Amino acid sequence: MIIKVGDNVSVNVRKILPREGKVTNISIATTADDPAGEAGMQVKEYDTALDYAGSIDYETENGDQYWAYFSQIEKDI
């Protein structure tokens, strides 16, 4: 799945219902001790088939801001 800044995604937050929001940032890890990619590269687009470590920042419809690892993204909506 290709994810782009501005896409709406569904994120597994280990609850009954996933959380949905708009991607505001994509970070790719460049070192093993930074799995979320906070100190890594910020990109505008990422293909999850590449299976890199990293994370997204996203904002819900009501303005709450969260982040999630790539592995938590369920789908692009």
Q: What spans do the regions from the language model cover?
A:
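Short linear motifs in intrinsically disordered
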Residues: 1-2, 37-50
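Short coil-to-beta transition motif at edge beta-strands of beta-rich domains
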Residues: 1-14, 22-24
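Serine/threonine-rich, low-complexity intrinsically disordered segments
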Residues: 4-5, 26, 32-33, 50, ...
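Short polar/acidic secondary-structure junctions
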Residues: 14-15, 48
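Short loop/turn positions at the edges of beta-strands in beta-sheet-rich folds
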Residues: 15-17, 62
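Short beta-strand-centered aromatic/proline hotspots
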Residues: 18-32, 40-43
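Intrinsically disordered, low-complexity, charged/polar segments
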Residues: 46-77
